[in-house]
Regions:
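Non-transmembrane "mature" sequence context
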Residues: 1-130
Length: 130
């Protein structure tokens, strides 16, 4: 068994990764008109933290793994919706409409980590058909 000192270091995130992901999450939430309280539930952070994120005074960080990963998933979902629907208004309507395949509105489902992943897989499956 290798000693801890002999193990390769984990890859480090780029110093600006937090600012980049935070801005991408802010932009995605803004374009999709996701309210701050819903964004807080999607990212698993407090409403105050979501408010600071939207104001640009808080940055997501790889050290805070859960919110980091959920932020990445939200941006992936936005990009997939953009590729599939091509217009923010259509994506907003899709997020807030009842969806028989998902059993509820995608936005409501996204408020849990499992639900966000489920919505992302659903959208990616439809993207794969194109």
């Amino acid at each position: 068994m290798k000693a801890v000192a002999d193990r390769p270091a984990l890859p480090q995130a780029h110093p600006e990764a937090g600012a980049t992901l935070s801005k991408a999450v802010r932009n995605a939430a803004g374009l999709l008109e996701i309210r701050q309280n819903a964004l807080a539930r999607i990212l698993g952070v407090s409403p105050a933290t979501a408010s600071r994120l939207c104001a640009g005074t808080y940055q997501l960080s790889p050290e805070r793994g859960k919110e980091w990963e959920l932020g990445i998933l939200l941006v992936r979902l936005f990009r997939s919706l953009d590729a599939l629907l091509g217009h923010d208004a259509d994506a907003r309507k899709w997020l807030t409409s009842d969806n028989l395949g998902l059993g509820q509105t995608p936005l409501a489902l996204m408020e849990s980590a499992e639900g966000l992943v489920r919505v992302l897989h659903y959208v990616d499956a439809h993207r794969g058909r194109i």
